[in-house]
Amino acid sequence: MKYNSVIRKAIFLRRPNRFQAYVVLDDEELLVHVPNTGRCREILKEGCTVLLRKGTTPNRKTPYDLIAAYKGEVLINIDSQIPNKVVEEALINKKIEKLVNFNNISREKTFGNSRFDFKLQDDNENTYFLEVKGVTLEENGETRFPDAPTERGKKHILELIEIKKLGMGAGIIFLIQIDNVNKFSPNDETDPKFGEALRLAKKERVDIFAYNCKVTEEEIELLNPVEIVL
């Protein structure tokens, strides 16, 4: 998926709250929007290089969105709206082997008490619900989710288990927005209940996928499956 807007490089200064950050752009301090409510503390450190996307809404208080940051030499996407777009592109291009037979792709569909990112159907009208989680927390090539407690994430997993029990397909895909990683695990230290729910989902035959991404300053796309350690 190519970024379809003007991308600028800046230097990160600080993040006063979840939604905003201060950066230096063209030698001036500037307030920008952060489209990610996660902590991202291991990424957004003072002095790191970040990518800004020009906003399309006129007269915005924050003219740019902070969408990615360099952690050393590695570029990590942090825009929480991007993972769904990347997965949708991968579904259309048949990059996720287990889901290649699902040609009807619908976004943001409700089942039970949850709204899921995708509802898929094949030519025989078999139905599959898919939830997407963007992953940015990485250390020594190993990635984890979540980086902050997520009651909503646990709720999604439990709903996927119920969908599976009703005879439909159900899966969760962890889109790791980094390319040089080799392992994914739930972050039990931060949110043990999420990890418990994910292990229960595996036991109940909910599909669990983890893929890394090719991330550049021009585009991001789903790359390869990553080992999952529960």
Curated annotation (Swiss-Prot):
Q: What is this protein called?
A: Sugar fermentation stimulation protein homolog
Record PANTHER family:
SUGAR FERMENTATION STIMULATION PROTEIN A
| Annotated Pfam families | SfsA, SfsA_N
Family membership, please give it.
Belongs to the SfsA family.
Q: Which superkingdom does the taxonomy of this entry point to?
A: Bacteria
Gene Ontology molecular function, alphabetical: DNA binding
